[in-house]
UniProtKB/Swiss-Prot annotation:
Name of the gene encoding the protein in the UniProt record: RSP14
Keyword Zinc-finger: no
Localization (cell): Cytoplasm; Cytoplasm, Cytoskeleton; Cytoplasm, Cytoskeleton, Flagellum axoneme
InterPro entries given in the database record: ARM-like, ARM-type_fold, Armadillo, RSP14
PANTHER family in UniProt: RADIAL SPOKE HEAD 14 HOMOLOG, RTDR1
Gene3D superfamilies in UniProt: Leucine-rich Repeat Variant (1.25.10.10)
Family named by the database record: Belongs to the flagellar radial spoke RSP14 family.
Keywords carried by this UniProt record: Cell projection, Cilium, Cytoplasm, Cytoskeleton, Flagellum, Repeat
ARM repeats: 24-67, 69-109, 111-150, 154-198, 204-244, 245-286, 289-328, 330-370
Protein name: Radial spoke protein 14
Keyword set includes DNA damage: no
């Protein structure tokens, strides 16, 4: 091949690689990845654009970024929270609200996101979304609030929301969901309220629920055997938290909560539900009224004895606490002994390897054997006259 032919072949080779069509323009609704720090302002820009399809895609993109701790902080710093909260209030599109509520659940997974959510009225927006016509939006809103309420700052913010009207309204909504057959959302509502009661300073929250919402009689109604187990479990858990107040203990006895709780003191009941119910009994039976309500419930004390099983440690501790409380009533001690409490407690005391279980068993043994003052020496403790 002469030089001219080689030149022509080379030109054809170059033309073959140069003759490419221009890249096609992307459609208006295409969402492309932004790299490094460009991604976060771009995300906020797309969340606030005029195109509904782009906004939905941006909400899904935000979930991907929020799943990374480093990116989570940068999303918050870029201003994603108010943009997502605004989309949660978009009354024109159920799907947008659904995506927004689910994205806020991821945002609230970290305390920095939960705090930012509270600062931009996100908690009020989520509380309003609990009454959304779309069931999917309500489900996601409950999930987001439960996630945010893991932090004490959010619990305090929820207490103050709506001038103190949000938590009582949550109690009403939980009842409405239970009556409507939506057991899952009713349970979520009760779990959210229980989480709020775990605030470091919870006197205001308890007051809103006990005094304003009149939660005690409602919770007693939710303990009825015909209701779904998850609802009864969540109701027992919340009742135990509210029963830290003395007037709530008395009210729980008056509305008949004690016999309903004792129904859960059985080996046939799922352990988590039994654990919560017996814990609530332990709180209520501190009062004299609670002791005699348990004593007068048919088969109630035998039920407590039946769950004295060290295989389920927390349930066993709760049951021994309740037994110790009830045994302060003289009439209860004979019934407990007849139900076989003595040998069970002694076995737990002798075989326990955890100090808190051993101490709870010792307290229950001493209380069941009590005849007169002064108290006998606690089992396992050294004699009083020893140095």
């Amino acid at each position: 091949m002469d030089s001219q032919a080689r030149i022509q072949a080379n030109l054809r080779h170059i033309q073959a690689f140069e003759a490419k069509p221009n890249p096609k323009a992307l459609p208006e609704t295409a969402v492309t990845r932004g790299f490094e720090k460009v991604a976060f302002p771009k995300l906020v820009r797309e969340l606030t654009c005029d195109n509904a399809v782009v906004r939905k895609k941006s909400l899904l993109a935000a979930r991907e970024l929020l799943s990374s701790p480093v990116n989570h902080v940068q999303c918050v710093a870029a201003g994603a929270t108010p943009a997502i909260v605004a989309l949660l209030q978009d009354q024109t599109d159920d799907e947008t609200r659904y995506y927004a509520a689910g994205t806020l659940k991821l945002l609230a997974a970290k305390e920095v996101g939960a705090r930012d959510l509270a600062q931009h009225s996100g908690l009020d927006a989520l509380a309003a979304a609990l009454e959304d016509p779309s069931e999917g939006v309500r489900d996601e809103a409950y999930g987001a609030l439960i996630e945010a309420a893991r932090f004490d700052s959010t619990r305090r913010a929820l207490e103050a929301c709506g001038s103190g009207a949000v938590l009582p309204r949550l109690m009403e909504l939980a009842l409405l969901e239970a009556q409507g057959g939506a057991a899952g959302r009713a349970q979520q509502g009760l779990v959210l309220l229980f989480t709020c009661t775990q605030a470091r300073h919870n006197a205001g929250i308890l007051s809103q629920l006990v005094d304003v919402a009149q939660a005690i009689p409602h919770l007693a109604g939710l303990l009825k055997p015909e209701l779904p187990m998850p609802v009864r479990h969540a109701a027992a858990e919340l009742l135990g938290a509210l029963a830290t107040r003395e007037d709530a203990k008395i009210q729980a006895v008056q509305v008949g909560a004690v016999p309903l709780l004792l129904l859960a003191a059985s080996p046939s009941v799922p352990v988590p539900f039994a654990t919560s119910a017996v814990a609530a009994l332990g709180a209520i039976t501190i009062r004299r009224e609670g002791k005699y309500a348990a004593l007068e419930s048919p088969g109630g004390l035998a039920g407590l004895v039946s769950v004295l099983d060290p295989c389920h440690e927390q349930l066993c501790i709760n049951a021994m606490t309740a037994v110790s409380n009830v045994a302060e009533a003289p009439e209860a001690r004979a019934i407990l002994v007849a139900s076989g409490a003595g040998p069970k407690l002694q076995h737990i005391f002798e075989t326990a390897t955890v100090e808190v279980v051993k101490r709870a068993a010792a307290q229950a043994i001493r209380q069941c054997r009590f005849k007169h003052l002064p108290y006998e020496v606690l089992p396992g403790a050294p004699p009083i006259n020893e140095e």
